[in-house]
Amino acid sequence: MQIFVKTLTGKTITLEVESSDTIDNVKAKIQDKEGIPPDQQRLIFAGKQLEDGRTLADYNIQKESTLHLVLRLRGGMQIFVKTLTGKTITLEVESSDTIDNVKAKIQDKEGIPPDQQRLIFAGKQLEDGRTLADYNIQKESTLHLVLRLRGGMQIFVKTLTGKTITLEVESSDTIDNVKAKIQDKEGIPPDQQRLIFAGKQLEDGRTLADYNIQKESTLHLVLRLRGGF
């Protein structure tokens, strides 16, 4: 069948393809016609960036569909994600991609829902709203993918301003760990945080399980006064 590829300059390229062709194949055909290396090509259809290993049929691209070709920003790069089984996944990313974006790409490739993914880099768990640049993750960096234990859960932390923060935690996390997660999200040093649950102030060395804090529990965050004791 024929499909069309429209570039940002407005030029339209016509390609002969099969439904079973992969996005890699299509990029190779574009290289043949236009001389643009595949690693500089990003193909968009129906608002979605197309992943190399998938086929046209996977994206329901039919005859006379129009794809959009965007040249990859210089910030484009490959990173690797290693699973506990030892498998390594290669992802095409931008420095400005959020951890959410990366988890979505992993879902596209591996079928693992984002809420079951924990990504680790340099020993640190990566928070969804942050970007690769925030963590200084550069080209060919390797992230580690850990599947979230069944003990993994969300809890909420409500501040005196009324803002509610959502945290991903394990029952075995200590109050110290929780304060560190709050610092990552909100920038509040742990020594200025007091956490309250069921009217009780939580002690740093104890775990969430110790206080019977379960999924979707709400903690209250009170800022410690300077000089307070």
Curated annotation (Swiss-Prot):
Glycyl lysine isopeptide (Gly-Lys) (interchain with K-? in acceptor proteins) crosslink site(s): 76
Any one annotated GO CC term: cytosol
The organism's place on the tree of life at top rank: Eukaryota
TM annotation in the entry: none
Entry-linked InterPro entries: Ubiquitin-like_dom (IPR000626), Ubiquitin-like_domsf (IPR029071), Ubiquitin_CS (IPR019954), Ubiquitin_dom (IPR019956), Ubiquitin_ubiquitin-like (IPR050158)
SMART domains: UBQ
Pfam families membership: ubiquitin
Gene Ontology biological process terms in this record: ubiquitin-dependent protein catabolic process
Subcellular location: Cytoplasm; Nucleus
Signal sequence residues: none
Propeptide position ranges: 229
Record key words, sorted: Cytoplasm, Isopeptide bond, Nucleus, Repeat, Ubl conjugation pathway
Other comment: Ubiquitin is encoded by 16 different genes. Ubiquitin is generally synthesized as a polyubiquitin precursor with tandem head to tail repeats. Often, there is one to three additional amino acids after the last repeat, removed in the mature protein. Alternatively, ubiquitin extension protein is synthesized as a single copy of ubiquitin fused to a ribosomal protein (either eL40 or eS31) or to a ubiquitin-related protein (either RUB1 or RUB2). Following translation, extension protein is cleaved from ubiquitin. For the sake of clarity sequence features are annotated only for the first chain, and are not repeated for each of the following chains.
Family membership noted in the UniProt record: Belongs to the ubiquitin family.
The protein, known as: Polyubiquitin 11
The species this protein was found in: Arabidopsis thaliana
